[in-house]
């Protein structure tokens, strides 16, 4: 996919500045207000090569938006608490509220790629299938998810690194992040290409950006953000209207008629019940031990009517388990 990006894209600086400062700046603020009014949450993932000036792209974009409506995250590593939780727990906690926006300069993709270059005992574990499933949950939940990758040439990356090292304002930032790409361009290009091929899905496609010229990159990102959020707000609003609860009682009864299909006449005699209870409690005990040694976690959820027997079912289930694990 990266080979499809035209890194030679150029635009006249005067025209580009006018479009960025006036037209696109206004449009970015407008689509943010529209998303807020509709109650649609937005997630922007800004990935790319190291030294592709993503911070400047994000910083410029935020100048045109209401700071009360967005949060910017840069997930470069997991702390000890994060490591004890499922991989995506960190990101679930950072999801924007309805109408708000979360922007990632580094996201779950950065941490996933770190696996290939970090020491094995420091790596975090997930797969592209897990990422696709996570993103499908987001888009199914009506989050507007936009993913960008800032592509650049090896020569431009080296030039940007030199410029950054010369900039005193960058001196506070540690230069030893999870990995350094300079000098390993082909290795990382292969890694990024595999990542995008595996995660370029219909519900969450990648938008590839030409990053050799910073102003062109800003133009491409901002234009796409405006276009995609506009489309997403229209779809979100239409879907919301279609799902508006009906005031017709008979229609509502049909919607929840699934419970009438449950066979409540089923019974089991006491002897059979006792025999099967002991049998399956023994199986549960063995499975718990196996899960413990394999490091597999489990969650059991019980829902139902009051006095339906949920408490009794839980007691019989836990009676077969070791309470310490």
Q: Which residue stretches match the model-derived regions?
A:
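Glycine-rich phosphate-binding loop of ATP-dependent small-molecule kinases
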Residues: 1-325
């Amino acid at each position: 996919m990266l080979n499809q990006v035209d890194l030679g894209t150029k635009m006249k600086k005067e025209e580009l500045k006018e479009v960025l400062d006036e037209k696109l700046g206004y449009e970015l603020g407008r689509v943010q207000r529209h998303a807020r009014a509709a109650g649609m949450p937005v997630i922007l993932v800004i990935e790319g090569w190291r030294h592709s000036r993503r911070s400047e792209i994000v910083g410029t974009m935020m100048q045109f938006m209401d700071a009360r409506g967005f949060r910017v995250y840069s997930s470069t590593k997991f702390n000890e608490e994060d490591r004890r939780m499922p991989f995506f727990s960190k990101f679930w906690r950072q999801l924007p509220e309805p109408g708000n926006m979360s922007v990632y300069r580094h996201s779950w993709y950065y941490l996933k790629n770190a696996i290939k270059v970090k020491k094995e005992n420091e790596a975090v574990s997930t797969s592209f299938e897990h990422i696709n499933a996570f993103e499908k949950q987001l888009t199914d939940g009506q989050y507007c998810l936009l993913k960008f990758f800032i592509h650049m040439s090896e020569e431009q990356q080296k030039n940007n690194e030199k410029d950054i090292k010369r900039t005193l304002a960058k001196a506070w930032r540690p230069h030893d992040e999870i990995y350094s790409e300079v000098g390993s361009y082909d290795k990382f290009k292969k890694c990024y290409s595999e990542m995008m091929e595996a995660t370029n899905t219909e519900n969450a496609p990648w938008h590839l950006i030409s990053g050799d010229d910073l102003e062109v990159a800003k133009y491409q990102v901002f234009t796409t953000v405006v276009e995609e959020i506009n489309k997403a707000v229209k779809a979100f609003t239409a879907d919301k209207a279609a799902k508006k609860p009906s005031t017709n009682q008979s229609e509502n009864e049909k919607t929840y008629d699934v419970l009438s299909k449950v066979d409540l006449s089923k019974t089991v005699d006491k002897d059979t019940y006792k025999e099967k209870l002991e049998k399956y409690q023994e199986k549960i005990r063995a499975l718990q031990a196996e899960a413990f040694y394999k490091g597999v976690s489990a969650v059991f959820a019980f829902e139902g009517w009051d006095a339906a027997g949920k408490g009794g079912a839980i007691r019989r289930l836990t009676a077969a388990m070791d309470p310490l694990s």
